[in-house]
Amino acid sequence: MKCIAIDLDGTLLNKESVISAENREAIKRAVDAGILVTICTGRATFDVKALLDDLDIPIIAANGGTIHDTGYRLISRTLMDQEAGKAIADYLLSKNIYFEVYTDDHLLSPFDGEAKLHAELDILKSANPNEQTDDLWQGAMTQFKQFGIKPIPHIESVFDGGENIYKLLCFSFDMDKLKQAKEELKHHKKLAQTSSGKHIIEILPASSGKGRALTKLADIYGIETQDIYAIGDSPNDLSMFEVAGHRIAMENAIDELKEKSTFVTKSNDENGVAYFIDQLLSGQYA
């Protein structure tokens, strides 16, 4: 049995954050051919479920924080240490860095989150008048369009209420702030960091990660490493590549993924996932 693990943003989703009909139909063809297809993403499970619509396939979400099988049955979850999470949240608040908290039912964000990012972008534009900021703002708005996002007045209170917390996501246009946050995170041994974009830091439990979750799902189905096909574009897909026998980088992927890949497919705006699946099903990719 083969397994295809597919990232979402920058991979299965196009620049409009939509799954094209071509990609959706290709996944169905792979499933009909007896291949286990799973989504492996940094997004929350409920957000993925809303996007997948009629595709009943396993979901690895929150960078490995949760694994759901077909039928939306929870297989595994890896929770963030509350004390460690609160410590880094306090740091982010002290530096005025926008962040979201991934829980079972919501993506919790600060009540003033959108205004905070808009102020950062205004500063960036003032310092760099020739900077093209429309695409940057569109990237920020993707965060606020996610299913289940819920702005709250005192986001730090989530760490006192007994919520299951899987991940924190930071977003900033201030690269110095992000650099400092990455350095701060190195002191928190119970936490790990990765990224799905230039302006993003994803914070997760040290024992979490896409690669570990993909290995766990493959073990449940009795799938060997050489039969795992991982498709991605960003730094948070590197751990998937480490456990997959076949590593498919998108044309729009970072260079490090392309260097580690066994195949480079078309971009996410050219239905690159569908292109690779068709190559695999037709025998053109061995």
Swiss-Prot record:
Its EC number is 3.1.3.104. The keyword Ribosomal protein does not apply. The active site is at D7. GO terms for molecular function: 5-amino-6-(5-phosphoribitylamino)uracil phosphatase activity; magnesium ion binding; phosphatase activity. Its cofactor is Mg(2+). It comes from the Bacteria. Belongs to the HAD-like hydrolase superfamily. Cof family. Catalyzes the dephosphorylation of the riboflavin precursor 5-amino-6-(5-phospho-D-ribitylamino)uracil and of flavin mononucleotide (FMN) in vitro. Also catalyzes the dephosphorylation of phosphorylated 5-6 carbon sugars and monophosphate nucleotides (NMP) in vitro. This is 5-amino-6-(5-phospho-D-ribitylamino)uracil phosphatase YwtE. It comes from Bacillus subtilis (strain 168). The gene is ywtE.
